[in-house]
């Protein structure tokens, strides 16, 4: 499956990743290779292969709640794309 440079740039923008021109070409090739391999995996015959076991198949698996100290606003807001003092700034979505 082919992916365009514009697709990679759009994905980087959505993920808020800074990608320069030299990286776009490399990422475009890498993502295309990954998507091509996914197409190959779709064709694999898995009839007769038992389902995986373990945590992935667990239903209603709960753990006990444990109170842990908060890391504080400096840590939690460190990667926020936009902030105002100790608050996240998000786009307005209501009229």
UniProtKB/Swiss-Prot annotation:
Quaternary structure (record): Heterotrimer of A, B and C subunits.
Reactions catalysed: L-glutamyl-tRNA(Gln) + L-glutamine + ATP + H2O = L-glutaminyl-tRNA(Gln) + L-glutamate + ADP + phosphate + H(+); L-aspartyl-tRNA(Asn) + L-glutamine + ATP + H2O = L-asparaginyl-tRNA(Asn) + L-glutamate + ADP + phosphate + 2 H(+)
Keyword set, alphabetical order: ATP-binding, Ligase, Nucleotide-binding, Protein biosynthesis
Gene encoding the protein: gatC
Enzyme nomenclature, EC number: 6.3.5.-
Protein name: Aspartyl/glutamyl-tRNA(Asn/Gln) amidotransferase subunit C
Superkingdom assignment: Bacteria
Any one biological process term the GO annotation gives: regulation of translational fidelity
HAMAP family, A to Z: GatC
Function: Allows the formation of correctly charged Asn-tRNA(Asn) or Gln-tRNA(Gln) through the transamidation of misacylated Asp-tRNA(Asn) or Glu-tRNA(Gln) in organisms which lack either or both of asparaginyl-tRNA or glutaminyl-tRNA synthetases. The reaction takes place in the presence of glutamine and ATP through an activated phospho-Asp-tRNA(Asn) or phospho-Glu-tRNA(Gln).
EC class: ligase
Coiled coil: none
Stated family: Belongs to the GatC family.
Pfam families: GatC
UniProt GO molecular function: asparaginyl-tRNA synthase (glutamine-hydrolyzing) activity; ATP binding; glutaminyl-tRNA synthase (glutamine-hydrolyzing) activity
